Amino acid sequence: MEKPDSVKKLCEASLRVDTSLLKMLADADIRGRICEDKNGLLEAVELFEIFCREQDCWSKPREFATDCARFHYFHAEDSYIDYIPHEQFKCEVTMLSGLPGMGKDYYIQSAGMDMPVVSLDAIRRKYKLSPTDKSANGRVVQMAKEEARTYLRKGQDFVWNATNITRQMRAQLIDLFVDYGAKVKIVYLEQPYHTWRQQNKSREYALPESVLDKMLDKLEVPQLTEAHEVVYHVV
């Protein structure tokens, strides 16, 4: 509560967890401790509940007037929490997010997405570059960004088809898309573990198990604060 941007951090937390359960956990943790400042810590927990109630996120997610208002609040400096920005997007970018073998290509086909697709895998195959060749990753991403810019300049909706498994990776792309006036929708895809592994083995360009393990360790599931819209397609 005493940290910078405490309101913003609290509201973000409320979109991820039930704040009343968070307080319950903290209270139980403190009562189980043997320490001199137990009363002070218990008082801080009670103040946390008051703070949540003041910000209208006690036992519920903080609500925003629109998805765009939520995105603006978490991405703009010193933004007013109840500000409702004017929505005038030039195009919409659908960013897929998911580990290799989770069915991103199948999702594009089954969803009937009649728009261009910027695919990092397609670029790698075109230039015969291995997905495990880290030295080529930068080149592939730059080519994909240039392709994306052609659609952004024209105001053309498109799909960005890549793993996008870390928040930092997504943020860099979202900043680019938003600079061109695009609305960004993240679609996160996840299959059961054994289904995922089997689907990878069945792919024409299957990845080694060791590579999948490393990517799984790095996975950061997209949060509602990251884009104008976040969809969880979890089977």
Task: State the predicted function of each range.
Residues M1-K90:
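Divalent metal-dependent phosphate-bond-processing catalytic cores, especially two-metal-ion Mg2+/Mn2+ enzymes
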Residues E92-G112:
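Glycine-rich phosphate-binding P-loop
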Residues T94, D114, Y193-V235:
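Conserved GTP-binding G-domain of TRAFAC-class P-loop NTPases and closely related GTPase folds
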Residues K154-G155, Y180-K185, E226-V230:
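Short glycine-/polar-rich loops that comprise or flank the Walker A/P-loop
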Residues N161-R170:
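Acidic, metal-coordinating catalytic cores used for nucleic-acid/nucleotide bond scission
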